[in-house]
Design a protein with these regions (language model features):
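Anion-recognition interface
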Residues: 44
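A structured beta-alpha segment of the ubiquitous adenosine-cofactor-binding alpha/beta core
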Residues: 1-9
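Accessory alpha-helical/coil subdomains and C-terminal extensions
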Residues: 3, 14-16, 24-37, 41, ...
Length: 188
């Protein structure tokens, strides 16, 4: 409250996704309860590309995230080719696989795994692994001992608690309750 009153802030403008919008809403409600009037405007920016916009109109943030992701993914693919290895990338997107798909498509990745692939079945670690292994086998048959797969983080967010427990994966969670995939540890 002190920051807002000291600086005579009358308008809170936020740019971001769901978490940013909900945080801004909580701030505005807190200030309102303290009898401090403030207007709150939120500009949706999401790399998920999942807002109901006209066909062919990407969300603010998606194109730049896809372009930067494709630069990284191309470099990883070159490393895979020159080293004769396979690499697996994870792309952001808690609830939609658009970014992973866009990156994988731009780089012609042999395997792209997105949550939308599992709309009629439960996502399991075994299914994810089998998809990647099937791609490795197909490429080997074609005479290629290298490759890369991109997996949307939404695939991991959709794992059931039981599946996570069985896998031995230990998640930490951010302040919004989302698993922090960059801080995953394995049970010993």
């Amino acid at each position: 409250l002190k920051f807002f009153t000291d600086n005579n802030v009358k308008l809170l403008v936020t740019v971001g996704g769901d978490d940013t919008a909900s945080t801004a809403n909580r701030i505005a409600k807190f200030l309102e309860a303290k009898k401090y009037p403030i207007a709150n405007i939120h500009v949706p920016k999401t790399i998920d590309n999942d807002l109901p916009l006209p066909k062919g109109t990407p969300t603010f943030g998606y194109e730049s995230a896809k372009d930067k992701g494709a630069v990284i993914a191309r470099a990883v693919y070159v490393d895979a080719r020159t080293s004769g290895n396979w690499f697996v990338l994870a792309a952001m997107g808690r609830s939609a696989g658009h970014l992973a798909f866009g990156i994988g498509e731009a780089c012609h990745y042999p395997m792209i795994v997105i949550p939308e692939m599992f709309d009629k079945t439960e996502i399991t670690v075994e299914k994810i692994v089998n998809l990647v292994i099937s791609s490795i086998i197909k490429r080997k048959i074609m005479g290629m001992d290298y490759g890369a797969a991109v997996i949307s983080e939404g695939v991991f967010h959709a794992l059931s608690d039981e599946e996570i427990r069985k896998s031995g994966i230990h998640f930490t969670y951010d302040e919004h309750g989302h698993p922090e995939l960059g801080k995953v540890s394995k049970a010993h």
